[in-house]
Amino acid sequence: MSSCSNVCGSRQAQAAAEGGYQRYGVRSYLHQFYEDCTASIWEYEDDFQIQRSPNRWSSVFWKVGLISGTVFVILGLTVLAVGFLVPPKIEAFGEADFVVVDTHAVQFNSALDMYKLAGAVLFCIGGTSMAGCLLMSVFVKSYSKEEKFLQQKFKERIADIKAHTQPVTKAPGPGETKIPVTLSRVQNVQPLLAT
């Protein structure tokens, strides 16, 4: 299993090689004591990689779709209200022998009809979008059951791996009082005081 310093070190070496800059002078080695990895070790291990959940993205999709559908419905209702509540203008007036047709009134009334049509279309698009997104939210919850199953399977796999590995250090048994060879002799590394 690779450590974070190995992963980060390889990335830093690649970045230094690509950047082409060299450092001269006194170097601080604090970076070896503090990990600056933004990625987790588990993301680089093949044993611990799992597929990212499609649940998050589909959740975002249906929420954004529901909001946009609501906006379309409100916009459609507003445009429909304008189309129906604004009174149409009189297009033709006059006597039976002499009738005058107002072209601006004809254009205005056709614009009101277009408002009614556009409002109905926007309302239908928004309603369809809202219905589809609400159905999508139901199907997303069924994905979460599958995801829980995959998480449980992953936890079982991790438990199997932990069960088969031996612990690094064990507490000595009741009859074991041996000192390890490396710790049997303690060597002082501090300089002696000159008296």
Curated annotation (Swiss-Prot):
<keyword id="KW-1133">Transmembrane helix</keyword>
<feature type="transmembrane region" description="Helical">
    <location>
        <begin position="120"/>
        <end position="140"/>
    </location>
</feature>
<dbReference type="GO" id="GO:0007399">
    <property type="term" value="P:nervous system development"/>
</dbReference>
<comment type="function">
    <text>May play an important role in neural organelle transport, and in transduction of nerve signals or in nerve growth. May play a role in neurite extension. May play a role in memory consolidation.</text>
</comment>
<dbReference type="InterPro" id="IPR024883">
    <property type="entry name" value="Neurensin"/>
</dbReference>
<keyword id="KW-0966">Cell projection</keyword>
<protein>
    <recommendedName>
        <fullName>Neurensin-1</fullName>
    </recommendedName>
</protein>
<dbReference type="GO" id="GO:0016020">
    <property type="term" value="C:membrane"/>
</dbReference>
<dbReference type="GO" id="GO:0030426">
    <property type="term" value="C:growth cone"/>
</dbReference>
<dbReference type="GO" id="GO:0030133">
    <property type="term" value="C:transport vesicle"/>
</dbReference>
<dbReference type="Pfam" id="PF14927">
    <property type="entry name" value="Neurensin"/>
</dbReference>
<feature type="transmembrane region" description="Helical">
    <location>
        <begin position="66"/>
        <end position="86"/>
    </location>
</feature>
<keyword id="KW-0472">Membrane</keyword>
<comment type="similarity">
    <text>Belongs to the VMP family.</text>
</comment>
<dbReference type="GO" id="GO:0043025">
    <property type="term" value="C:neuronal cell body"/>
</dbReference>
<dbReference type="GO" id="GO:0031410">
    <property type="term" value="C:cytoplasmic vesicle"/>
</dbReference>
<dbReference type="GO" id="GO:0043005">
    <property type="term" value="C:neuron projection"/>
</dbReference>
<keyword id="KW-0812">Transmembrane</keyword>
